[in-house]
Amino acid sequence: PIYHSKFHELCRRLKQINSKIDIVTNGSGKKKDWWKKLCEILTSEDSIEFSIDGLKDTNHLYRINAKWDSIMDAIKIVTKYKINTTWKFIVFKQNEHQIKEAESLSKELGIKKFKLIKSDRWWKKDLMPSDEYVDPIYEHQISVTKGTDKKSTIKQGCMTVRNGAPDNLLYIDSDGDFYPCCKTGLYGFRYKNIFSPKRKKYNIVNNTIEQILNASEVTKFFDKTKSYDTADNCCKIYCGGNKTND
């Protein structure tokens, strides 16, 4: 989100209405003055989560084109303020040996929290880390993809009330495209459902959120989440499987 041309203005408006802002970013490509300006807008209730998957020699392998030095410059500025900071580290084969060193560096830089993420984002087998760092959802994802998954329950993450109206975790990406959640907006799923950006149908430039949610095929999409059998594969993977309805 930090690459939006009016990001500072948007943050300022949100703070004027007493909103709490949580920013997740790779932290790359912005000048020091840009970060200082942002930090002067944010307060101690806001947070910035830096997505850094490795160290200088490995982070760019997943975070394509990320510039290490500019990320370090950003962190050194942000940590001078009372903003909550997190280093989020997704584990891959190429960086699992750097976990302890990265955590140590995060403390040295003054980052408040180091968060280790097990992942299922494998487009190549050689990216898979050791078993202890593989997200348990990975095996379920494979079975859904192959059609060998067993019938299960489903917990609708997009609804605070089961089988109610979609009102939770709804997602709009940096291009203004709407998705039921951030997972359906992932590259591996976004082109396989009715919300595909190629259709140019559910973008907030041309529609209000209310108009999108009231569209016939959108209501049908959410209706299908009531049953594991009829739900979209993405919903089966992230809201079904070994999850419960508790």
Task: Give each language-model segment a name.
Residues 30, 150, 191, 243-244:
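Polar low-complexity intrinsically disordered regions enriched in Ser/Thr and small residues
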Residues 1, 27-28, 54, 184:
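Active-site metal-binding loops of divalent metal-dependent hydrolases
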Residues 163, 227-246:
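Cysteine-cluster motifs in flexible loop/terminal segments that predominantly coordinate metals
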Residues 26, 200, 242-245:
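Juxtamembrane/interface motifs at transmembrane-helix termini
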Residues 1-5, 28-33, 92-97:
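Acidic-and-aromatic substrate-binding clefts and catalytic sites of carbohydrate-active enzymes
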Residues 8-13, 17-20, 36-207, 211-214, ...:
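Radical SAM enzyme [4Fe-4S]-AdoMet core and its adjacent flexible, acidic
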